[in-house]
């Protein structure tokens, strides 16, 4: 465990050092007195801002194809930064882009700042992207210096992913069940990044806690492990002196994250699945002021033809009595303004997020409601001669859902419901195997989590390739041609065959240039010393014997 060196002194005893808090970990009392809360931000809003910033980093990094370690590192930077600064001073989306930009360089998966900003622009609306100012790149670059000074240049961060895979290899039992447990625990780690667990506990303890939670939900009790005789519980071989209460507290914090999504799911599904019924009650709200639309319609009817009026009467008989006037689309703007204004007033008076989410959820999925309006256009087109005038009005009705956020005085209070929709699919080259970006925070993910809690054999994806060692495959044996029958592998190879112009005896005699025995020996004089042949003068020199001393000196 890394200790806080700033707060420790040499005089502190070893017993006190064991209880010294790590430099990047706080208790719940400290988390209740963050700079944001000291400036008047309530804890629920701060938790929502942290969740939205983490999901923003997760979604941007996933679309850019970054590794899960890079995403987790950026989110850890994000949480640590706001332990020293307030959300009111530093917008969360600019900080999230800066943290992802720095994490990419630290984890050796860098991305250009303009690419991060471009991806952020595709995820945020105009009001949310307005936090980046006129020069988004300059905003990120300036904030990077503040981020580095805030985290004290402590850039290396460990994550529960590596410990989760390491611990899973030490478990014994059914491999399929262990694989399901690891897959589920991996998803819990992804979702735990949206909480402050990384500011409370080490990654080793979080890895054990998510395995404990996954085992409880999968109804898989870990009974066999490698060091079972030495330890009473399976997690004691990985982390010691961790009681069950700590694991239970971590599990409850993760489940509380899903309980918030469960409360908002009933408001989220009707907007997507039951869009036509939601369009019908809208004209019912202003039934009292129907006289105003009727006056507007009467004012617009004189320049029209009688055929148009007859067509309108036919539509009124064919359709429900709730939709008798298809033309009051201009007054419909005033109706929506009346409906939106009380919501804004309620939001100004009630800071908790639940009243905001139903309204915001309709801003992000504009694609599903784009299909019902074409069903309503055909009855209006034959009835009205000026279809071009009605078309833009109805198309403007769709962006009207996005108009309320700009009217809001505080743009920070208009976040996208990122935690309540599944992240975008990663590119094909992102991971070969399990999708490491899975989450139970979306509507579909929470339903699958509920089904897994009821059934014993849930369906999971494949494990990441690094979770278990791959099967050892013997190397392929090369198919050489069989040796000839007379081949002797122990016999030394023959000497290289030289060209025919160089005649070399096949087996030269031992020695250095010794003549053969039949060579006639030279004659030896009586003195015993063989005569020395005269030296051969170099070419162009006169014989030495013809030169005397006097001639040589000349």
From Swiss-Prot:
Q: Where is the composition biased (Pro residues)?
A: 402-428, 466-542
SMART domains linked to this entry = CYCLIN, Cyclin_C
Tissue-level expression reads: Ubiquitously expressed. Highest levels in testis. Present throughout the seminiferous epithelium. Also highly expressed in the developing oocyte.
A GO MF annotation of the entry reads: protein kinase binding
State any GO BP term from the record: negative regulation of stem cell differentiation
Region: Disordered, residue numbers: 262-554
Q: Which InterPro entries match?
A: Cyclin-like_dom (IPR013763), Cyclin-like_sf (IPR036915), Cyclin/Ssn8 (IPR043198), Cyclin_C-dom (IPR004367), Cyclin_N (IPR006671)
In this chain, where does the modification Phosphoserine occur?
325, 329, 341
What family, per the record? Belongs to the cyclin family. Cyclin C subfamily.
Kindly state the subunit structure of this protein.
Regulatory subunit of cyclin-dependent kinases. Identified in a complex with a kinase and the RNA polymerase II holoenzyme. Interacts with POLR2A. Interacts with CDK12 and CDK13. Its interaction with CDK9 is controversial.
Q: What is this protein called?
A: Cyclin-K
Q: Which organism is it from?
A: Mus musculus
Lineage, top ranks: Eukaryota, Metazoa, Chordata, Craniata, Vertebrata
